Swiss-Prot record:
NCBIfam families hit by this protein: dephospho-CoA kinase
UniProt entry keywords in alphabetical sequence: ATP-binding, Coenzyme A biosynthesis, Cytoplasm, Kinase, Nucleotide-binding, Transferase
GO cellular component terms, semicolon-separated: cytoplasm
Species of origin: Rhizobium etli (strain ATCC 51251 / DSM 11541 / JCM 21823 / NBRC 15573 / CFN 42)
Protein name: Dephospho-CoA kinase
Length: 203
């Protein structure tokens, strides 16, 4: 079973590309969605223990957590030590199910693919990218986003140029959704051909 790692910096269109892969029939494990799910349940008391006052009605108050992290950027390490093992556990459960179901390939949407070393456990890396001005416009249009918050997030992510350099495939989201979809379908078609040729014998 071929494991495709999908990544891209904030505002590049990674989530949209992930959905396009899923629409094309590729099973998707979305790390962001898993974190949202964990914050609404299992991880909430653990996060609250490390960041007092961040739990509200049994779930993580993301706004309060973000406020505390902005004041103490070192807190990201504590948060990741709590969340990453839980996300990894869910990922392994997803992979086991897809393997049992006979999936030919799966997509792992991992925002911090390079930063966490997750790139080592995938067979192919797809990076989503766009022009830096388009990226900035998209991100600053989000609710509760500021220039300072955007710059802080970027500082924690591998630079786009480095991601592009390490990609096996690149999806450019600078243009229309139709053009983005065409790129995704082309990648899937090529990967299916490569699987048939035996390019991924260890996958």
């Amino acid at each position: 079973m071929l494991k495709i790692g999908l990544t891209g910096s904030i505002g590049m269109g990674k989530s949209t590309v992930g959905k396009l892969f899923a629409e094309a029939g590729i099973p998707l494990n979305d790390s962001d969605a898993v974190v949202h799910n964990l914050y609404a349940g299992e991880a909430a008391p653990l996060v609250n223990a490390a960041f007092p006052g961040t739990m509200k009605d049994g779930a993580v108050d993301r706004h309060e957590l973000g406020r505390q992290l902005a004041l103490d950027p070192e807190g990201f390490k504590r948060l990741e030590a709590i969340v990453h093992p839980l996300v990894r556990k869910r990922e392994m459960e997803f992979l086991a199910k897809q393997q049992a179901d006979g999936a030919e390939m799966v997509l792992l949407d991992i925002p911090l693919l390079f930063e966490t070393g997750a790139w080592e456990r995938v067979d192919v890396i797809v990076v989503v990218s766009t022009d830096s001005q388009i990226q900035r416009q998209r991100v600053l249009a989000r609710e509760d986003m500021t220039e300072e918050k955007f710059d802080m997030i970027l500082s924690r992510q591998t630079p786009d140029a480095e991601k592009r350099r390490r990609a096996d495939y690149l999806v450019d989201t600078s243009h229309s959704i139709a053009e983005t979809r065409a790129q995704v379908l082309e990648i899937i078609a090529e990967l299916k051909m490569r699987i048939a040729k035996g390019d991924f014998r260890n996958a």
